[in-house]
């Protein structure tokens, strides 16, 4: 398996799209292996596998900084940062790996101890300000789900990012869900953006002063790489709005998104993934 050999995101750099998709499939299997034995967040992680692979392919962590909101969707990130054993081994191996981002566990790649909703943008603006004071040039990327956007601290973070006016990338992982369905005025605009492929007249993010990119195919690695490449090294506050499917790749989690948000251990048969005989660079 590729993921048994990946020790850092740099190991993705020489892979072509076919191989990256195999890596994504292996990660999905590994996530299911862990949650089936240990319990944990199912749907949020499965829906963000491809985006995580694309983010780590395009950006250069640990120089570039990722901040995960709640961080319940960070399992794929952990697999790609040298912690695959916590997803492939037995329960004792899994107990070593937290279900959330943890600097104590991996200070190089986990920037904050997180577990609450709506915090990622404000935390990222702290990194943004510190970078600007130091005169550095790393990318700061906040990842937040549509469900977390209704939290007050998310509003504060958007306000501060816009006020600072320098480079920050906010990836809005829009799966049309929080734990359950979303309700409220924000979600009417998100729906209008989805239905218009990001082109509707009233754009909540542009009103805040953000550059804005929309991607309908939020579980397509090739398309994700293209949109992330287009905003890499930006010097402006930028939102990348991706439409994903919660539970993607696991039919029970897609069929019942609320039930499969988090789960106790369940029966799951781990399957191997066919690998190509050669690896070609994506270029």
What are these regions (language model features)?
Residues 2, 6, 31, 75-79, ...:
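Generic structural signal of hydrophobic/aromatic residues within well-ordered alpha-helices
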Residues 8, 74-81, 85-87, 96, ...:
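Non-transmembrane, interaction-prone segments in cytosolic or luminal domains
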Residues 23-26, 95-100, 200:
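Short hydrophobic/aromatic-rich motifs at helix boundaries and adjacent loops
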Residues 40, 47, 71, 75, ...:
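Solvent-exposed, non-transmembrane amphipathic alpha-helical segments
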